[in-house]
Design a protein with these regions (language model features):
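Core alpha/beta nucleotide-donor-binding catalytic domains of modification enzymes
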Residues: 2-112, 120-132, 139
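Class I S-adenosyl-L-methionine
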Residues: 145-165, 169
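Generic N-terminal simple sequence motifs
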Residues: 74, 107, 154, 187, ...
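A structural signal for conserved, well-ordered secondary-structure elements
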Residues: 116
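Short, solvent-exposed coil/turn linker segments
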Residues: 58, 63-66, 151, 170, ...
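S-adenosyl-L-methionine-dependent DNA methyltransferase catalytic core
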Residues: 1-33, 137-141, 163-234
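Conserved S-adenosyl-L-methionine
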Residues: 56-58, 120, 142-154
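Solvent-exposed, flexible loop/coil residues
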Residues: 66, 71, 86, 95, ...
Length: 234
């Protein structure tokens, strides 16, 4: 399935685009971004420098007819309402309801596929009720989907960064997932894990120039993180 996707040319829109990280990944695999949306001024400025175009603003003000036809919708919708580091208000937080703005555009435009991203905390938020609502909405939109919590360190990135990823396909395309019951024309496989060749302690020099010195407080903080991560994921 991955090889087939790379050989295809498809159009995408990039919602909650930030500075364009998701867009870069999709473009490296054959996508053409036809529209993006981001509300943060500073993120928009960086996005414009990266891609020479300014994203649309507030997603709640975007009308379906404002969007060029596209095949895939991507959305890293706000994670703060569901994050361990946030207030964990979920759908009670205005930002949490922005998932329904994504659903609104999916319903109106019926793209072939979607890719959603959030923090891992969304899975257990509100005793699982939040993820249940999201699943029910996506089912009602008539999409076949699966989600995973994946750690960036398992896929070639030297950082422990767990995120929730959800991939979905319009049901009429007859695309299923590995291990899913039923017969499908095409099976989608989530990426396989890989082993990192180096740990942090393998690349940090033992002796460095005084010109790179930092404050004692900063040094203590750095040493704390080095000790925590030098052995790699556990």
């Amino acid at each position: 399935m991955t090889r087939m996707i790379r050989n295809m040319k498809y159009r995408m829109i990039d919602l909650f685009a930030g500075i364009g990280g998701i867009r870069i990944a999709f473009e490296e695999n054959g996508a053409k971004c036809v529209k993006s949306s981001e509300i943060d001024k500073y993120a928009c400025d960086t996005y414009e420098k990266n891609f020479h175009e300014m994203p649309l603003g507030d997603i709640t003000k975007i009308k379906p007819e404002d969007l060029t036809d596209f095949d895939i919708i991507t959305a890293g919708f706000p994670c703060q309402p569901f994050s361990l580091g946030g207030l964990r208000k979920g759908f009670e937080d205005t930002r949490g309801t922005l998932f329904f703005e994504v659903a609104r555009l999916i319903k109106a435009k019926k793209p072939k596929a979607f890719f959603l991203e959030n923090v891992e905390g969304i899975v257990n938020h509100d005793s699982g009720k939040t993820i249940s609502v999201i699943e029910n909405v996506l089912h009602d939109l008539d999409y076949n989907f699966q989600w995973r919590v994946m750690n960036a360190s398992d896929y070639g990135t030297p950082q422990n960064r767990k995120r929730w990823y959800c991939v979905g396909f319009r049901k009429d395309l007859d695309i299923g997932f590995e291990g899913q019951e039923g017969k499908f024309k095409v099976i989608y496989n989530f990426p396989s894990k890989c082993v990192l060749k180096f740990k942090v302690k393998d690349v940090i020099e033992a002796n460095v120039s005084d010109s790179y010195s930092v404050s004692e407080t900063c040094e203590r903080n750095i040493n704390t993180y080095v000790e925590k991560f030098k052995e790699g994921p556990r």
